[in-house]
UniProtKB/Swiss-Prot annotation:
The keyword Ribonucleoprotein belongs to this UniProt entry's keyword annotation: no
Residue stretch of the organelle transit peptide: 1-52
Gene that specifies this protein: ISPF
The protein's name in its UniProt record: 2-C-methyl-D-erythritol 2,4-cyclodiphosphate synthase, chloroplastic
Pathway: Isoprenoid biosynthesis; isopentenyl diphosphate biosynthesis via DXP pathway; isopentenyl diphosphate from 1-deoxy-D-xylulose 5-phosphate: step 4/6
Induction context: Circadian-regulated with a peak in the late period of dark phase and early period of the light phase.
Keyword terms, alphabetized: Chloroplast, Isoprene biosynthesis, Lyase, Metal-binding, Plastid, Transit peptide
């Protein structure tokens, strides 16, 4: 009985082996395809609406300059920079004070480099257009204008937006003349123009070690950093 069972198993094994050799055992055929979207995808990115260059340009007018910052923050920081060429025949005015010198700033207005960069610092903190856009040199009404006019407008915009000066730090860069004898007068006048306590207005002066136009007494520059606080 055992021999008969063994023969049956061997016979079955041989039959199975011959079937594999002659005709491989295959799984039911299944179609495997690559997924493709019904519609072709475009790799180009198209905005929902076309925006022309003109629409992104800032149209500087009263409605723009009087607009309050869209986001109310407890503090706002601004930076201003300005540079003017020094030429004979012009007065040198810094912070609204006439400084004795053999040359002054060649500019469309009175060329007060300090007040100009302070204005830009305030406007920058408020997120508004710069001084050149609000008071363009292409407008004849600003020719020879006192820069105190620009400061007053910047202060008005700051007040309208609900901010006041936390502190201001300015640096003058010029080779000549020496600013130290005039520094306190300039700082005091700047504080008055800003309506700020003198303790929050700081002024420094640096030479340019006789390097480039600043060091050669051919130009004057100024930097200002300002912190505005919500009233």
């Amino acid at each position: 009985m055992a021999t008969s069972s063994t023969q049956l198993l061997l016979s079955s094994s041989s039959l199975f082996h011959s079937q594999i050799t002659k005709k491989p055992f295959l799984l039911p055929a299944t179609k495997i395809g690559v997924w493709r979207p019904k519609k072709s995808l475009s790799l180009s990115c198209r905005p929902s609406a076309s925006v022309s260059a003109a629409s992104s340009a800032v149209d500087v007018n009263e409605s723009v300059t009087s607009e309050k910052p869209t986001k109310t923050l407890p503090f706002r920081i601004g930076h201003g920079f300005d540079l003017h060429r020094l030429e004979p025949g012009y007065p040198l005015i810094i912070g609204g004070i006439v400084i004795p010198h053999d040359r002054g700033c060649e500019a469309h207005s009175d060329g007060d480099v300090l007040l100009h960069c302070v204005v830009d610092a305030i406007l920058g903190a408020l997120g508004l257009p710069d001084i050149g856009q609000i008071f363009p040199d292409s407008d004849p009404k600003w020719k020879g204008a006192a820069s105190s006019v620009f400061i007053k407008e910047a202060v008005r915009l700051m007040d309208e937006a609900g901010y006041e000066i936390g502190n201001l730090d300015a640096t003058l860069i010029l080779q000549r003349p020496k600013i130290s004898p005039h520094k306190e007068t300039i700082r005091s006048n700047l504080s008055k123009l800003l309506g700020a306590d003198p303790s929050v207005v700081n002024l420094k002066a640096k030479t340019h070690e006789k390097v480039d136009s600043l060091g050669e007494n051919r130009s004057i520059a100024a930097h200002t950093v300002i912190l505005l606080m919500k009233k």
